[in-house]
Amino acid sequence: PGQIEKSAVNLVAFAKTAVLEPEQSQELTLTFDLYDMASYDSYDMNKNGASTYELDKGKYSIKVMNNAHELNECENAEIEFEIASNLNYKLDPKTKQIVKNRFTGDTAYAGVPIDGSTAGSKIEYLSRGNFGETFPVDATPNRSGAEVSKANSYVYNGYENNERYTTAPKQGQNYGDEHLRLWTRADGSPATTSDLQGTGGVELKLNEELVEKLGRNYKAPEWEQLLNEITEAELYYLVECSGYSNAEMVSIGKAKNYDYDGPSGLQANAGTPDGVDKGKWTGFGGQMNLAQTFNIELAFSMGRTIGNEAQATGISGWYAPGVNLHRTPYNGRYFEYYSEDTVLSGWLGAYVIKGSLSANVYCYLKHFALSEMGQNPTRLNVWVTEQALRETYLRPFEIAVKEGGANGVMTAFNRIGGTW
């Protein structure tokens, strides 16, 4: 009572030895931050006026374990320490951004809390503090068709006085002689649509100086100008017509790139460049097989191998890895995801991404977020507390972005709470 609800055991770090012969040993170093042990207090359960990542005061144990239940037999396998007063993370230790509730209460995104507190009926969440009273016994009956139709027709009207949503940026701006282009023809003239699609039969030249500036600093002024130059029609086309590719943009000299599925290796679907021999792509086992190895070096090798195959066959982006969690046996996409553990999933995904990026192939981390319910769960409302969202379902994505350098994300089909 008076503290944030938390599990008894959490994985914070893991490592794997080489193959050891009898009498051989190996020293392993495990590192983590106190932030990795923190709980998210979405409802201010410890009454300190903060809703952020926190460590409650009290005793903690760091254990070297073989699994979630079995302590390792090594020396000093358990170390206890005490935190004298609550530790709050007002800023994210890596990004330095403010940490606060974004999906709970009156300040929730789009005005719709994801915990269902404004949905008109109480949602009882399972609690470790009271399994008997909170464990569901009877299935919740389906709502009537009229109720579902009413819910589906809901429109959020809170955008009217928000400049962020009501003022569209001016697109298609022309900067004359200072106009920025990623690719031009070899003579410096603007590339055409067919040129950027690779069918124009002309040699193109990359603006290496511009690309280096853009890649070095996301706050570079060149980014603002480049985005201003893109036409509105090109933006729509990029969003609406980019399955297994991302479209060319004549306004900025962006070439068409091909992107491909999936987490177990490039899949032989339609849409690859002409002349690609898909039969030479490698099919890997399900991702839970990789997870069972606890081997981040192997994850890196897998990512690099697929990245090399992609580069050799004209593929620039990869729809992978998938870091959704195993929550039920009845999901036909679990071969694409690693495990039920957030930290294991996040770190394996991070190293797969590192491997792919080392071969100059970018990744689309997926499926963001809460897509644990099956085959592309469309029109599904997933109700969850912000604590569970952050600690469980978003954590693998957080690790993969912060530690793996993911620079692409594939969104899910479901709603989070009542918001899509």
Segments from the language model and where they lie:
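Glycoside hydrolase catalytic-domain context in secreted enzymes
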Residues: 1-49, 53-64, 68-70, 105-106, ...
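Short beta-strand elements
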Residues: 70-100
